[in-house]
Amino acid sequence: MAADTLSASILEQDDPQLIQEGAPAYLLLLDGFISRNPEDTALLAAGAQLYALYGSRFAADEQRAIELTTKARRYGRAALCLEHEWACSLELGGYETYVEQLSRVTRRDIDLLYAYAVSWLSYLDATSDDWTAVAELPWVEAALQRVLALDDTYANGAVHGYLGTLNALRPPALGGMPEVSQAHFERAIELSEGRDLGVKVEYARRYARLMFDQELHDRLLTEVLEAPADAPGLTLFNALAKEDARRLLATSEEYF
């Protein structure tokens, strides 16, 4: 209950600056709950996702982002490990063994697996200058693919948005799969009924810019700016998406 209440109070805010200034108090409170209940997997999963969000979007500098997402990663790992002993050594073998072990995660544990994947991805984003981070991306993608296999509608299809981004990181000439990226973004929009504005922003930023499709780029961003930000569990993300959409649209002519 405490984890749900804390998460909701942050995600329902439509003022990113207020969250930037006030969220550290929530994170400290959540840390306190976790220290008193170190085996509460729901609290750990909530901590993983909130630290991932704050580290990715509100950290003051690169080093701070690394520190915050490192904690997110630690919480995400701990939650899955506490639920399944075999998960404690999940990353110690090779990639093939890792993927095989992921198949043991069931629908009952989808919250934990999602938090594990998202917190890892936030850490890799914060350390993207490190080639080790690049090498770990397939591991995160495999975890997200497992979430997808368990329930592709989970979190209003947010996992499709992440997979859309991952599949657009490389151009076709370097082995990228833009058609797969586009399919994921379209599915994410469908599942959220267009309410997840962040998906449209990433669709424009990652896919449309990669493919030099200005018409799609500008249409998606205009839709974001014209849409309401308020949506259950998405209000903060949508407010941030609107900020990003304004910046991207302002540089459209220059980019294309």
What are these regions (language model features)?
Residues N167-E190:
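Outer-membrane beta-barrel transmembrane domain signature
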Residues M1-G157, R170, E190-R195, R209-F256:
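N-terminal alpha-helical interaction modules that lie
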